UniProtKB/Swiss-Prot annotation:
Record keyword Ribonucleoprotein present: yes
GO BP term, example: translation
Organism placement in taxonomy: Bacteria, Thermotogati, Deinococcota, Deinococci, Deinococcales
Protein name (database record): Large ribosomal subunit protein uL5
Top-level division of the source organism's lineage: Bacteria
Gene Ontology CC annotations of this record: cytosolic large ribosomal subunit
Similarity field: Belongs to the universal ribosomal protein uL5 family.
Organism this protein belongs to: Deinococcus radiodurans (strain ATCC 13939 / DSM 20539 / JCM 16871 / CCUG 27074 / LMG 4051 / NBRC 15346 / NCIMB 9279 / VKM B-1422 / R1)
Alphabetic keyword roster: Ribonucleoprotein, Ribosomal protein, RNA-binding, rRNA-binding, tRNA-binding
HAMAP family for this protein: Ribosomal_uL5_B (MF_01333_B)
Annotated GO MF terms: RNA binding; rRNA binding; structural constituent of ribosome; tRNA binding
Function: This is one of the proteins that bind and probably mediate the attachment of the 5S RNA into the large ribosomal subunit, where it forms part of the central protuberance. In the 70S ribosome it contacts protein S13 of the 30S subunit (bridge B1b), connecting the 2 subunits; this bridge is implicated in subunit movement. Contacts the P site tRNA; the 5S rRNA and some of its associated proteins might help stabilize positioning of ribosome-bound tRNAs.
Assembly notes: Forms a bridge to the 30S subunit in the 70S ribosome. Part of the 50S ribosomal subunit; part of the 5S rRNA/L5/L18/L25 (CTC) subcomplex. Is known to contact the 5S rRNA, 23S rRNA and the P site tRNA.
InterPro entries attached to this UniProt entry: Ribosomal_uL5 (IPR002132), Ribosomal_uL5_bac-type (IPR020930), Ribosomal_uL5_C (IPR031309), Ribosomal_uL5_dom_sf (IPR022803), Ribosomal_uL5_N (IPR031310)
Length: 180
């Protein structure tokens, strides 16, 4: 599962150095971390929903998720401060590359009517956000283990200064962007 990291070091980094004219290898953008987040609004009624979602996310990312809690009480949402509202995992290093490779090669092609990911989902600082509607696209999750389909947000944090640099990095890493 070192293919993506090897590809970055051998092909992507030299190509980006030439394309953007970096003087140092350390100036070339790289992927810093990947944050996978699941918001669980239904956890207020069903206390086991967080446990089930955490188990599924741990299978997908190979890392135990942390439970995120509400910062403020909001009476309209029947939400109290400190109530669990979601789960998240921050992937770095080896696990990050394993997850990204799994997402590119297995997960994204299994999405129904997939024509590529949105090329405009950059935040202006070189980070990319991707929303996935169901967790069934990952091979670790079978249809039998799922009680409810849950979506997730995937944020790819890069060291790129601009969106153009980040897009070039992610495109050369193999992320299939939609043609505009």
């Amino acid at each position: 599962m070192q293919q993506l990291k090897t590809k970055y070091n051998d092909q992507v980094r030299p190509a980006l150095m030439q394309q953007f004219g970096y003087s140092s290898v350390m100036a070339v953008p790289r992927i810093e971390k990947i944050v996978v987040n699941e918001g669980l609004g239904s956890s207020k009624e069903d206390s086991k929903a967080i446990d089930k979602a955490a188990k599924e996310l741990a299978l997908i990312t190979l890392q135990k998720p942390i439970i995120t809690k509400a910062k403020k009480s909001i009476s309209n949402f029947k939400l109290r401060q400190g109530m669990p509202v979601g789960i998240k995992v921050t992937l770095r290093g080896e696990r990050m590359y394993v997850f990204l490779e799994k997402l590119i090669n297995i997960g994204l092609p299994r999405i129904r009517d997939f024509r590529g990911i949105n090329p405009n989902a950059f935040d202006g600082r070189g980070n990319y956000n991707l929303g996935i509607k169901e967790q069934l696209i990952f091979p670790e999750i079978t249809y039998d283990m799922v009680d409810k389909t849950r979506g997730m947000d995937i944020t790819i944090v890069t060291t790129a200064k601009t969106d153009e640099e980040a897009r070039a990095l992610l495109q050369s890493m193999g992320l299939p962007f939609r043609k505009q």
